[in-house]
Amino acid sequence: MSTRNSQSIRSSCDRCRSHKLKCTVSPEDSRSGPHKCTRCIRAQVTCVFGPRSQSKRTPNGKNKPEKPKPELEPPQKTSPPVCSSSLAGMDLGSPGAWTPWIDDLASQETEEPLPIDVNTAGDGSGPSDGDFWADLGMTQELNMLELAPTNTYQAQYLASFDYVAPPVAEVGHLMDISEPSEHTPPHAIVQLSTLVTKIHETSKALEESPWSNVPDAKQLQNYPIGRVLSLSQDFCSILGCIWGKVSISSDGQSSGSGSSPTPSADMLDYAEVLSSIKITQDPTASSSMAASVDMPTALLVLSCYTSLIKLYSLVFAHFENHLSHLPEIPSPYPSQAALASHRWGLQLGELPSADETCTKICTAVQVLLDAFQSVEDVFGLPRSFSAVRQRTCDMEGMDFSAELGRTSLWTDYMVHFVVRSNAIRADTEECEEMRELSTKVRSLKALIREKMNL
């Protein structure tokens, strides 16, 4: 091109140089006139080819008189006035009028500035802009809308994001949020899940133990009643924590407007439970009993309760099996004739003791029943619904409204879903388990009295 022959004029116009774009000069015989690049012609702006700055170095190493350098405005300042001055003669309604603005916006937002050598910048001996783009193989004109951020820019962005992320993670707000998780329902759910697993493991170990086979008084001495007691006490402690939180929540709701809030889909409302079992709720207790029970927690509580019933039934069956196979021994108590002939100074300590095995089994049964009764007390189960009391299976003809009016939400939930609906029909496994435990308790007590001649 003719502009390349003259070293005093740059090979790229000021507009293309400011955007680091390839400048293609139009043919001189075109109607647009000489020395105009195709980009400026398309944008309908003035195309200016600025003079080069003369090199300070000479081939012979001699200093030449310096020529005054023309003061060039920065490219960032010259390009906007050129574009703005052309608005007066542009037809803003035509689609082609907005092409330069799209090119400018795309180049400013997506084009990455290329590195410039400060030693050769502004030096006439350095390669020209046209030669630089030609060396890169950019022989065709670029479409600015197809440009995308380079990997270097993305790496810098990701590096800056990674730098900001650690301080956010190190802030103590996350620890403050996670600290109360130990007192939230998920923590109770974890405890109940672990407890159910331990109960099932204990039941399986007792079923596979030698105590289930031929009864032996010596083996019975090593019976692990401590594990059963520990499971009952752990269950009672967990229930105490859960019921305490529900009571606090109920008190907090009753202190509000006095109306029961609408529970979520996974919550069981007290009024819904009572309406499902056709019991009229006391209107004076509507605000205080409006607490809701978390469904997973309630199901785990019921699972622990039924699993504990199975475990107790298994333990009492082992005790009954050993007692029934004990040999018949004469009564250790003296007859009335022997007592009459005895001297006047007979003392309590001189009386013979009963069978040691029967005494220990009786003590173990009493301790286990006390622990299980503590669990039912936390539930608030009345005597009519107790699994270890005499009136457990006598369900027909009972007034449930009289019992439920003085019980807790846990009681009503269990009565409807476990005790009442199943005990009356007597067609489910849960009912059979509760009946079996109650029957085991009564038969075991009768057998102990028989063996001890009580």
Swiss-Prot record:
Residue stretches of biased makeup (Polar residues): 52-61
Single GO MF descriptor: DNA-binding transcription factor activity, RNA polymerase II-specific
Gene Ontology CC entries for this record: nucleus
Positions of the DNA-binding region: 13-47
Domain of life of the organism encoding this protein: Eukaryota
Main location: nucleus
Function summary: Transcription factor that regulates the expression of the gene cluster that mediates the biosynthesis of trichosetin, a trans-fused decalin-containing tetramic acid with antimicrobial activity. Directly activates expression of only the three biosynthetic genes PKS-NRPS1, DA and ER, while TF23 and MFS-T are induced by the final product trichosetin and not by TF22.
Descriptive protein name: Trichosetin biosynthesis cluster transcription factor TF22
Source organism per UniProt: Gibberella fujikuroi (strain CBS 195.34 / IMI 58289 / NRRL A-6831)
Gene: TF22
